[in-house]
């Protein structure tokens, strides 16, 4: 899907937008614009304004018709969603009333052979959500075997990561690995699967994609930025698609919705006021009809929270995840 499609209904879209509870005059951020599905649903509420963000220039260009239709109610920004606070500042917005995030790779990216995200098509081994920076082919060509194994294990949750890394290093000595089909075939030779299992290369592709786009760093930064710009009573709705993403969202909201433990020596100083109130303790998941219509919905989880009036907490000083630049320079 190359344009914002009026027929496109995002995974858990109605549930996520209902969680936002858009109101007339409110300003909302669709932090992962994609095909424009969440934005269209928000704009159905009269008098709402949407800021749509996407790092993919194809998504932004594809939203031109929706911008023409919505007029001043819709502004599209090509950027990473971790830059929410800076984007708001550049638009003169001190606060917004709601933020929706649909984390990870989009369907239109997965379905494009030229983008190199999927082993279902033979294409260049790219995997970048934007147009700049190293590709997955660069990682496969340059990363040390140990680093490849760590990436595939940590980000892909692949228990055969060391065997996969060895196979990649052996194969790249014979010829450059530049296509999705090449990589998928290499992985399939060392990761065995039974009928009904996921494709043997699924987890390896996930691990490389997450590293190339630094997706988990981005998510952590975006959640912290959302905390900074949401008005009291503003709502955050996040749809995630695998356990690493969901764990980050769940942990962030759990930490921000509880009172700090305090200290018997300095109880007043140590105590932190909750910055969010949970809207759901258990994640919302897709029903069977949605899963049948869109199999990708099977793993989707929706979590939400409402911003309190407490001051935002300081963002994390540094990331604990492997960094792309470090991997490419060998540590």
Curated annotation (Swiss-Prot):
Purpose: Specifically methylates the N4 position of cytidine in position 1402 (C1402) of 16S rRNA.
Name recorded for this polypeptide: Ribosomal RNA small subunit methyltransferase H
Binding-site list for S-adenosyl-L-methionine: 36-38, 54, 81, 102, 109
Keyword flag rRNA processing: yes
Keyword field contains Manganese: no
Catalytic function, reaction form: cytidine(1402) in 16S rRNA + S-adenosyl-L-methionine = N(4)-methylcytidine(1402) in 16S rRNA + S-adenosyl-L-homocysteine + H(+)
EC number: 2.1.1.199
One annotated GO molecular function: rRNA (cytosine-N4-)-methyltransferase activity
Keywords: Cytoplasm, Methyltransferase, rRNA processing, S-adenosyl-L-methionine, Transferase
PANTHER family: 12S RRNA N4-METHYLCYTIDINE METHYLTRANSFERASE (PTHR11265:SF0), S-ADENOSYL-METHYLTRANSFERASE MRAW (PTHR11265)
Segments of this protein annotated with the region Disordered: 287-331
Family indicated by similarity: Belongs to the methyltransferase superfamily. RsmH family.
Comp. bias (Low complexity): 309-325
Location of this chain's protein in the cell: Cytoplasm
């Amino acid at each position: 899907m190359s344009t914002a499609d009026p027929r496109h209904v995002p995974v858990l879209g109605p549930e996520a937008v209902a969680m936002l509870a858009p109101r007339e005059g409110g300003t909302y951020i669709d932090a992962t614009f994609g095909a424009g599905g969440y934005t269209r649903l928000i704009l159905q509420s009269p008098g709402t304004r949407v800021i749509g963000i996407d790092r993919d220039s194809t998504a932004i260009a594809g939203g031109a018709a929706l911008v023409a239709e919505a007029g001043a109610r819709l502004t599209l920004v090509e950027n990473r969603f971790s830059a929410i606070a800076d984007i708001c500042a550049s638009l003169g917005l001190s606060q917004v009333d709601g933020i929706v995030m649909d984390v990870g790779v989009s369907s239109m990216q997965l379905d494009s052979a030229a983008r190199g995200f999927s082993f279902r098509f033979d294409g260049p081994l790219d995997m970048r959500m934007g147009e700049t920076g190293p590709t997955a082919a660069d990682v496969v060509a340059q990363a040390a075997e140990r680093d490849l194994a760590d990436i595939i294990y940590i980000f892909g949750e692949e228990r055969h990561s060391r065997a996969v890394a060895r196979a990649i290093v052996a194969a790249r000595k014979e010829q450059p690995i530049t296509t999705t089909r090449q990589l998928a075939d290499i992985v399939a030779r060392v990761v065995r699967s039974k009928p009904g299992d996921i494709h043997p290369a699924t987890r390896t592709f996930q691990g490389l994609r997450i590293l190339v786009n630094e997706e988990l760093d981005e998510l952590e930064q975006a959640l912290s930025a959302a905390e900074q710009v949401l008005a009291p009573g503003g709502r955050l709705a996040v749809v995630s698609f695998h356990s690493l993403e969901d764990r980050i969202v769940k942990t962030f909201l759990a930490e921000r919705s509880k009172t700090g433990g305090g200290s018997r020596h300095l109880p007043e100083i140590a105590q932190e006021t909750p910055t969010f109130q949970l809207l759901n303790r258990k994640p919302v998941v897709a029903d069977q009809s949605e899963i049948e219509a869109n199999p990708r919905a099977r793993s989707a989880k929706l979590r939400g929270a409402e911003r309190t009036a407490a001051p935002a907490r300081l963002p994390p000083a540094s990331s604990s995840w492997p960094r792309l630049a470090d991997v490419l320079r060998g540590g």
